[in-house]
Curated annotation (Swiss-Prot):
The lineage of its organism: Bacteria, Pseudomonadati, Pseudomonadota, Gammaproteobacteria, Enterobacterales. Pathway: Glycan metabolism; exopolysaccharide biosynthesis. GO terms for molecular function: phosphotransferase activity, for other substituted phosphate groups. InterPro entries: Bact_transf, EPS_sugar_tfrase, Undecaprenyl-P_galact_Ptfrase. It is found in: Cell membrane. Pfam families: Bac_transf, CoA_binding_3. It comes from Erwinia amylovora. Belongs to the bacterial sugar transferase family. This is UDP-galactose-lipid carrier transferase. The chain crosses the membrane at residues 16-36, 52-72, 93-113, 115-135, 175-195, 284-304. It is a multi-pass membrane protein. It is an enzyme of class 2 (transferase). GO terms for cellular component: plasma membrane.
């Protein structure tokens, strides 16, 4: 009976997601026609009825094929993928189908406005992911989306796997237990999740829908093999393996295996070493920076006036280390008093707590040097807007590692070479992952991860995340 129940649950989830995509694909067309040609009563003006009928029929057919592609080829309705990874696949697929639609329209010589085509597919890119997110939240409220999960392992790799899954809430993995494969874990709980010691305890929690995540340590390969066989003999259908690959570039990595051998070959991709990738990133930076400067020019003029009211220069440049170790002046709106250097020296000399905080992070949470307007522009990250000029000059990028002073390079230790491979960014993985609330070691890890796994899509994802972080003012001081 439970097998039937969970089979029905899985089918309901897949059909709900597929139906949502299909509906929003076609709502996008209807909305595009309304926006371009007016409201009902005016829609058919100047458009032959048979062409409109053919356009609608073609779009419905393409939407059905696209949903089939999502289901069968990309497995969006059967596999749970990270949000930004799935979104990239959705955008890429919709772009391909939009080109097919344009080709059909051109060959058919329809009189429909090309703006209908543009708006239809732009709306599809926005509405299909939005619809999916709504359906997943609705399923979650009905307790259908969450998938009971057990992590096989309790060491560092298993704990990092748990943290990664928690950061992707929309994947819906509800970890109910860790399983200690070799008895080495002394804690009874990790992150509030129980650590199981006995197999009997584990199997008592399992049903046919349970997701198993094998995340043992590198040196526990025998335990991994034993558990994969154990899960196979128990007919467990949902099994994932998270190998210990810390330090290995993951984005763009291809996997292959040698026939009849248990050997997996990972072909890693050093994207930032490619001239084409650097040209693409530079073009993206220039277009983005110049567009933002044009858009925010009135606000920049107002900020210059407000910051300079105390008699000091509104913009200052602080020396930072850039790509290949080249030094440059990193521009910012001045957020501190004019005699900030003397104030800092006095604070560090008289306050041992502040001295320790400065030595640890090169920052002070309650910095006495910051002015009233300085607090505001720091909280909102407006103090960093002059760095757009650094981007235009090619010294910085819109997205990249956090720009550091020379003294901080010692903290990067063996990862400093990764830092030198990329231009520092106005924003980056560190800024959207806690900013000042994370340890310096974690900052270094984020910078290294970004460089090893660079892609233009990751830059776009970080920029969108930055908007949310700035609005919520997370970790800013």
């Amino acid at each position: 009976m439970r097998e039937i129940e969970f089979t029905f649950k899985g089918l309901l989830i897949r059909l709900s997601l597929a139906l949502s995509d299909l509906i929003f694909f076609n709502i996008a067309l209807a909305l595009a026609i309304v926006l371009i040609n007016g409201f009902p009563g005016e829609i058919l003006t100047g458009i032959p009825q048979h062409e409109l009928d053919l356009k609608i029929a073609t779009h419905i057919l393409l939407s059905v094929i696209c949903v089939g592609w999502f289901w069968v080829r990309l497995r969006h309705y059967t596999y749970r993928k990270p949000f930004w990874f799935e979104l990239k696949e959705v955008f890429r697929t919709i772009l391909i189908f939009s080109i097919v639609d344009l080709s059909v329209s051109a060959l058919s010589k329809w009189e429909l406005s090309r703006w209908i085509w543009i708006l239809t597919w732009l709306l599809s890119m926005a509405m299909v992911p939005f619809g999916r997110a709504c359906v997943k939240r609705l399923l979650n409220r009905k307790k259908l989306w969450k998938k009971q999960s057990i992590i096989i392992g309790s060491g560092k790799n298993a704990q990092e796997a748990w943290q990664a899954l928690q950061s992707e809430e929309m994947m819906g993995f509800d970890v109910i237990a860790f399983y200690d494969v070799d008895g080495s874990q002394t804690a009874l709980e990790l992150f509030g999740v129980p650590v199981l010691k006995e197999e009997q305890q584990l199997w008592s929690l399992v049903d046919s829908d349970t997701q198993f995540i094998v995340a043992v340590e590198y040196e526990q390969s025998q335990s991994r093999d034993r558990w994969l066989k154990n899960l196979a003999t128990h007919n467990c259908r949902s099994v994932s393996v998270i190998p210990s690959l810390r330090g290995v570039p993951l984005y763009g990595t291809d996997m292959a295996y040698i026939f009849s051998h248990e050997v997996m070959i990972l072909r890693v991709s050093n994207n930032l070493a490619k001239h084409s990738s650097r040209f693409l990133k530079r073009t993206f930076d220039l277009v983005g920076a110049l567009s933002i400067i044009t858009l925010l020019l009135p606000a920049l003029v107002i900020l210059i006036f407000m910051v300079s009211r105390d008699g000091g220069a509104p913009i200052y440049g602080h020396e930072r280390v850039g790509r290949d170790g080249r030094k440059f002046k990193c521009l910012k709106f001045r957020s501190m008093v004019v005699n900030s250097k003397e104030v800092l020296e006095e604070v560090l000399r008289t306050d041992p707590v502040a001295r320790a905080e400065w030595d640890e992070d090169f920052k002070l949470k309650n910095d006495p040097r910051i002015t009233r307007i300085g607090h505001f522009i720091r909280k909102t990250s407006l103090d960093e807007l002059p760095q757009l000029w650094n981007v235009v000059r090619g010294e910085m990028s819109l997205v990249g590692p956090r720009p550091v002073i020379e003294a901080e390079l010692e903290r990067y230790a063996g990862d400093v070479d990764y830092y030198f491979m990329a231009k520092p960014g106005m924003t980056g993985l560190w800024q959207v992952s806690g900013r000042n609330d994370v340890s310096y070691e974690t900052r270094v890890y984020f910078d290294s991860w970004y460089v090893k796994n660079w892609s233009l899509w990751n830059d776009i994802a970080i920029l969108f995340k930055t908007i949310g972080v700035v609005l919520k003012r997370d970790g800013a001081y």
